[in-house]
Amino acid sequence: MPTAGSKKKAPTPQISCLTSESYTQLDFLPDKLRTKLLPFQKDGIVFALRRDGRCMVADEMGLGKTIQAIAIAYFYKEEWPLLIVVPSSLRYPWIEELEKWIPELEPEEINVVMNKTDIGRIPGSRVTVLGYGLLTTDAETLLDALNTQNFRVVIVDESHYMKSRTAARSKILLPMVQKARRAILLTGTPALGRPEELFMQIEALFPQKFGTWIEYAKRYCNAHVRYFGKRRQWDCRGASNLSELHQLLNDIMIRRLKSEVLSQLPPKVRQRIPFDLPPAAVKELNASFEEWQKLMRAPNSGAMETVMGLITRMFKQTAIAKAGAVKDYIKMLLQNDSLKFLVFAHHLSMLQACTEAVIESKSRYIRIDGSVPSSERIHLVNQFQKDPDTRVAILSIQAAGQGLTFTAASHVVFAELYWDPGHIKQAEDRAHRIGQCSSVNIHYLIANGTLDSLMWAMLNRKAQVTGSTLNGRKEKLQATEDDKEKWGFLQFAEAWTPSDSFEELKDSVFTHFEKEKQHDIRSFFLPKLKKRQLETTCDDPEAFKEKITVASDPRKMATSDSTADKNGCEPEAKRLKSLSTEDHSSALEEGPSLQARATSMEVVHEVKPPLASPALPEKGWQCGFCTFLNNPGLPYCEMCENPRSRAAGRNHLQDNNKNDEDAAQESTSKSDQAGLECERQCPERLEAEQSANSKEEALEGGGEDRLPSQPEIGQLNNSGTLPVRETFMFCASRNTDRIHLYTKDGKPMNCNFIPLDIKLDLWEDLPATFQLKQNRSLILRFVREWSSLTAMKQRVLRKSGQLFCSPLLASEEITKQQAKENNTRRYITKEDVAKASMNKVKSDGGHIRLITKESMTQDSSLKKIDSACVPSLNPCPADLTVEPSPSKGYIQAVDKEGRPLCLRCQHPTCQPEQTAKASAWDSRFCSLKCQEEFWIRSNNSYLRAQVFATEHGVCQHCGVDAQELFLRMRDAPKSHRKSLLNAAWTAKLPLEQLNEMLRNPGEGHFWQVDHIRPVYEGGGQCSLDNLQTLCTVCHKERTAQQAKERSQVRRLSLATKHGSDITRFLVKK
């Protein structure tokens, strides 16, 4: 495929020609990117080009530094490969921006480094995205690969991460930036609190420009000798000659403030809310204050570590002391139903207190702290931005205080302060940035008599230093102090203490008297129900009783109908009758609301076993217009492209010789039951298909039904010049939701789109060619097929990186290509790996070694065996002379040339010269793909994490969000947990399991990873496409059903040994 660089020739930026013709030179940028740039952003690009692509863009947070850096790097694309170093939580947002603004980048050309051994795709990628967390001294394999690649263009986002001269990541990153020909540093806070934090960034861009470190420190950091006790220390934490430093920085740094370039942006209003605390709440804190004062008055102040440890303890005590008042303040804000706000805190105890306040107010929330994976943070941000019911975001200042966008919030609350103004301003501007439509009110909760007062004064002193250095004028955190009497109620807040003991749970657990309630005596006089008629509503036991009564009493059919409509379910008898006597359109009108059933927390669990996957007809379906027999997986007719009706999806095609009425009725009943199961499992899929169908019908219908945002199809002035395509090829991005377009010959069209945008009639990402009806219908057909796939199948298709015409056919082909060997063992063990390695050595020669995480290797004697053997990770015949059962590490094969072989596929992982540099532990796998497949098949925690990244803990059978309930249970006060479980879908679980959820809630109590094809049927050691998320209730029911089926199989097999089954004579032939 042609490379992106073959399209345009980048002009060589000359300093002399950028004075009057600078904006003209920006025409080199892609049209979509150029038109999106604001005037001040264009100035930033010109500033960088004048300095040959080496500068710092230090605009205030929220002014679009990312898009400026992408545009600057695009000018030098002939010099790529490009390295982008970002905080780990910002890797995927950066890739989204790259694919959005540079559509000529193909999915295979962007590489995200996932771990310290993921180096396989670095040499062949044009763009490599790397997280700061991987820049450690023990990442030798990764560092060697990065240095070998010789990146000519480097972007360092949030470059203030390099502030420390002694940090490992600063020492590693410094030579990489210095060696690159172009380097763009991005940060909204170059110095978080002191001028010393600027030196490493300046040194990376222009070595020795400001002299050596000693010279810089003496001149601008007021460096002097200071004594801590008897220890002599060089103190560089001061500031001096700031106006001179500001003038010198202007030559290498461009910085604009929102107040200067975005006058139309609503203002940011800071407000201090002081309040007093009751004496009982600050008792421990006062004792620490007295200890600190004694320590500072002593002639020898003692070790610095002792002083800093005491201050850290006081910081935490301040958080606990004011937590009760913060809870009351949050509850007060939640009384305004239209308010969405952010709450920032630092300590986990304060985050926990804020979360408890939201749960007690029965409001929906998100929480992002250091334990939340970076991929899940994007999902939570989207939830807060788009869901009107999610009203609160509880955020860690360090984990979520930079790089994320929360413009849906109009208020920001600081439950705690932090040590430097840089982090505070970064957190403020999560809401106050481009895209904000209302003024942002920022409230600082300041508890009098605590460390808050000292920290506020310190923040203002540091703000003056950073303001003079970066902006050329003294600044401070200007916040008006609100009326103290207005917030007087906070001083009467109940003290909050962390609930770590089990004493609170003595009266908050379930008992046998609560679980085994006395039954209604009238139930003994009612006929027993069949299993398919039993339905239980997890949240409403009364509704459960009502359904049983209605379903079992035929004299109350009228009441049954009304109840079914109200609860969103149809009785079995009514559903069978309507489907057998009415057409599909009337059935569609009478059907319940699928979306309501999917999103409601009152999920209906049936006693019958859950289906492993959506039920599809075995013999295909017949088009109602052209009568063509279609593949059962296609949602549209292959001949006439008519959308598949839901009636066709429910009914199997009957053979011509099957005219018996009873057989037909039985077939209809079974297929209808399967169709309803499919609806229950995949409501989003059906809704997406209906949405896509309606849009295509609108395109093909009359003029009044066409898309309002697009020109009239067939009446375009230049319609004759736009090419009409017979078909397109597609490639799904590995890391984002975007789909890249190719011609039928596999040539890139340099455009991409998000399927959800097409559903919402947003076509801006696609060129004018797609205004034509035929071209647009191809995209709509793709979106319809793509939406019909499960999230897991979409993920598998993305990771494959292949070109395809039809997502359904491509997914089916991937499933066929994957190994389908029967395996009744759940995981790969170390013994399996050892046997496979031994067999490889037997067949091909070489030797084996024991590798451990400590990088220790133990080589066994060389074994030259000529017998043939196919290496496999499946259990091999145990005919080995050596017992391969290492308690630690893995037995790995090494070939005759000294190359270690992959634990997964037994192919070489690296060359002999690379083996000497890399540790043995880092040479376990040949690629990231093999590594992921191995861990999925051998590590339960990794498997759960991968499934969670796709399905987010939502049950694929009943649609309940089990992860959300787990988070609420984990974060709720222990006294509230019982009421949460009583109102949730977990009421059917055993008493012991419910009480364990109360005492120590964990993810495994609420949702499980289930094998679609059971392990006992050969579905063990499988890939992700055979896994699904099930809530504990559904998983328990499915496990019970599978146990029953296995018992029946064993009983029948035992019976056949002594005679034939009599029931076989009753089966129709």
Curated annotation (Swiss-Prot):
<dbReference type="InterPro" id="IPR014001">
    <property type="entry name" value="Helicase_ATP-bd"/>
</dbReference>
<dbReference type="GO" id="GO:0043596">
    <property type="term" value="C:nuclear replication fork"/>
</dbReference>
<keyword id="KW-0547">Nucleotide-binding</keyword>
<dbReference type="InterPro" id="IPR027417">
    <property type="entry name" value="P-loop_NTPase"/>
</dbReference>
<dbReference type="InterPro" id="IPR001876">
    <property type="entry name" value="Znf_RanBP2"/>
</dbReference>
<feature type="zinc finger region" description="RanBP2-type">
    <location>
        <begin position="617"/>
        <end position="646"/>
    </location>
</feature>
<dbReference type="GO" id="GO:0006281">
    <property type="term" value="P:DNA repair"/>
</dbReference>
<feature type="binding site">
    <location>
        <begin position="59"/>
        <end position="66"/>
    </location>
    <ligand>
        <name>ATP</name>
    </ligand>
</feature>
<dbReference type="Pfam" id="PF00271">
    <property type="entry name" value="Helicase_C"/>
</dbReference>
<dbReference type="InterPro" id="IPR001650">
    <property type="entry name" value="Helicase_C-like"/>
</dbReference>
<feature type="short sequence motif" description="DEAH box">
    <location>
        <begin position="157"/>
        <end position="160"/>
    </location>
</feature>
<feature type="region of interest" description="Disordered">
    <location>
        <begin position="648"/>
        <end position="720"/>
    </location>
</feature>
<keyword id="KW-0863">Zinc-finger</keyword>
<feature type="short sequence motif" description="PIP-box">
    <location>
        <begin position="518"/>
        <end position="525"/>
    </location>
</feature>
<keyword id="KW-0479">Metal-binding</keyword>
<comment type="function">
    <text>DNA annealing helicase and endonuclease required to maintain genome stability at stalled or collapsed replication forks by facilitating fork restart and limiting inappropriate recombination that could occur during template switching events. Recruited to the sites of stalled DNA replication by polyubiquitinated PCNA and acts as a structure-specific endonuclease that cleaves the replication fork D-loop intermediate, generating an accessible 3'-OH group in the template of the leading strand, which is amenable to extension by DNA polymerase.</text>
</comment>
<keyword id="KW-0227">DNA damage</keyword>
<keyword id="KW-0511">Multifunctional enzyme</keyword>
<dbReference type="GO" id="GO:0008270">
    <property type="term" value="F:zinc ion binding"/>
</dbReference>
<feature type="domain" description="Helicase C-terminal">
    <location>
        <begin position="325"/>
        <end position="485"/>
    </location>
</feature>
<dbReference type="InterPro" id="IPR000330">
    <property type="entry name" value="SNF2_N"/>
</dbReference>
<protein>
    <recommendedName>
        <fullName>DNA annealing helicase and endonuclease ZRANB3</fullName>
        <ecNumber>3.6.4.-</ecNumber>
        <ecNumber>3.1.-.-</ecNumber>
    </recommendedName>
</protein>
<feature type="region of interest" description="DNA annealing helicase activity">
    <location>
        <begin position="46"/>
        <end position="481"/>
    </location>
</feature>
<feature type="compositionally biased region" description="Basic and acidic residues">
    <location>
        <begin position="652"/>
        <end position="661"/>
    </location>
</feature>
<comment type="subunit">
    <text>Interacts (via PIP-box and RanBP2-type zinc finger) with PCNA (when PCNA is polyubiquitinated via 'Lys-63'-linked polyubiquitin).</text>
</comment>
<dbReference type="GO" id="GO:0004520">
    <property type="term" value="F:DNA endonuclease activity"/>
</dbReference>
<dbReference type="GO" id="GO:0006974">
    <property type="term" value="P:DNA damage response"/>
</dbReference>
<dbReference type="GO" id="GO:0070530">
    <property type="term" value="F:K63-linked polyubiquitin modification-dependent protein binding"/>
</dbReference>
<feature type="region of interest" description="Endonuclease activity">
    <location>
        <begin position="1001"/>
        <end position="1069"/>
    </location>
</feature>
<dbReference type="Pfam" id="PF00176">
    <property type="entry name" value="SNF2-rel_dom"/>
</dbReference>
<keyword id="KW-0539">Nucleus</keyword>
<dbReference type="InterPro" id="IPR003615">
    <property type="entry name" value="HNH_nuc"/>
</dbReference>
<keyword id="KW-0234">DNA repair</keyword>
<feature type="short sequence motif" description="APIM motif">
    <location>
        <begin position="1064"/>
        <end position="1068"/>
    </location>
</feature>
<comment type="similarity">
    <text>Belongs to the SNF2/RAD54 helicase family.</text>
</comment>
<dbReference type="InterPro" id="IPR038718">
    <property type="entry name" value="SNF2-like_sf"/>
</dbReference>
<keyword id="KW-0255">Endonuclease</keyword>
<dbReference type="GO" id="GO:0031297">
    <property type="term" value="P:replication fork processing"/>
</dbReference>
<keyword id="KW-0067">ATP-binding</keyword>
<dbReference type="GO" id="GO:0009411">
    <property type="term" value="P:response to UV"/>
</dbReference>
<feature type="domain" description="HNH">
    <location>
        <begin position="1001"/>
        <end position="1041"/>
    </location>
</feature>
<dbReference type="GO" id="GO:0005654">
    <property type="term" value="C:nucleoplasm"/>
</dbReference>
